[in-house]
Amino acid sequence: MERLATRSSHDDPYSRSSLPTSNAINSNHESNGSTFSYVQSLRRAKATVWSDIGRVAPLHSSPSIKSSSQNGKSSSKGLGGMRSRVFSSQHHGVYHTRPASLHSRTMAPQHTILTPRLSATEGKDDDEDELVISTSNTAPTYISMIESSRASSTHSGTAPSIMGMSIHSRADSRAETTQSDGFESRSGSPTHDIQSYLVNRRSSSSESSDEDSAEEGMKRLVITNMGDNDEFDSD
């Protein structure tokens, strides 16, 4: 009985006695003098390294290979049908890479390619056109009512500019305010009358303050010059 037990232990590769211990591995390293890793030494001793041997073995059998091949064929057919239905570039225009039709305009696709929205800085030209249109549509009436003969005479026969018109309108309003205490309306729009009245008041007050300051400066210069001359005479 003991002989049978020893034989079965030697024949069975999974028995504990067949597995090398750490002492045996160390002794093998010392005796051989080679630098084998732990796994390599276990493989040399024909020991089982714990891996997927139990899972791999049934897959290599003939029935499992047949079933896997059949499953692969059916799955590939299903995937191919799905791809042809969903990812068809001819019917749906789905491009996984940049197609050659986008490089040339003759072969361009029929569907329109959407351009990105322009930012505020890129669309200045469109905004300026819109502003010009809006200003031309909502032009004030008092510009057309200004006498063009005065502007043309001052600009030597050229067309009257907006600056010239504004200057003449201010000059006319100043003359009106200096001649009469009240404000006479020249244009039919009340908003323009109020604006020109306020502008004339501000300009007249600023001009008077400038004139006063200039006169005071001249007086100071005269006084200082006279004082300097007196000092020189006394010397």
Swiss-Prot record:
Residues 15-34, 176-202 have a biased composition (Polar residues). Disulfide bonds: none annotated. GO terms for biological process: meiotic cell cycle; sporulation resulting in formation of a cellular spore. It is found in: Cytoplasm; Nucleus. Its main location: cytoplasm. The modification Phosphoserine is found at residues 180, 187, 189. Residues 1-14 have a biased composition (Basic and acidic residues). One of its GO terms (cellular component) is cytosol. Residues 1-34, 58-83, 169-235 are annotated as: Disordered. Keywords: Cytoplasm, Meiosis, Nucleus, Phosphoprotein, Sporulation. Involved in sporulation and has a role in meiosis. This is Meiotically up-regulated gene 123 protein. The gene is mug123.
